[in-house]
Amino acid sequence: LTCVKSDSIWFPTSEDCPDGQNLCFKKWQYISPRMYDFTR
């Protein structure tokens, strides 16, 4: 899984996380980063 580390709209950063630890979706990073901020 890929987790969003920064909620920046223009320059979101991500990192790989163990499955089940953090449920973030890379495809949503540039659309609504804050939407998945609560999953971290």
Swiss-Prot record:
Query: What protein family does this chain belong to?
Result: Belongs to the three-finger toxin family. Short-chain subfamily. Aminergic toxin sub-subfamily.
Q: Which GO terms describe its molecular function?
A: toxin activity
Instruction: Give any Pfam family that matches.
Output: Toxin_cobra-type
Which chain regions cross the lipid bilayer? none
Q: Which UniProt keywords apply?
A: Disulfide bond, G-protein coupled acetylcholine receptor impairing toxin, G-protein coupled receptor impairing toxin, Neurotoxin, Postsynaptic neurotoxin, Secreted, Toxin
Q: Which SUPFAM superfamilies match?
A: Snake toxin-like
Signal sequence residues = none
Assembly mode = Monomer.
Covalent S-S links between cysteines = 3-24
Q: What is this protein called?
A: Muscarinic m1-toxin3
Query: Briefly, what is this protein's role?
Result: Binds irreversibly and specifically to M1 (CHRM1) muscarinic acetylcholine receptors, blocking further binding of antagonists and preventing the action of agonists.
Where in the cell is the protein located? Secreted
A GO cellular component entry from the record: extracellular region
Cross-referenced InterPro entries, in alphabetical order? Snake_3FTx, Snake_toxin-like_sf, Toxin_cobra-type
Tissue specificity here reads: Expressed by the venom gland.
Task: Report what the Swiss-Prot or TrEMBL entry states about this protein's PTMs.
Answer: Contains 4 disulfide bonds.
Main subcellular location of this protein, as a coarse class:
secreted
Q: Which Gene3D superfamilies match?
A: CD59
So which domain of life are we looking at? Eukaryota
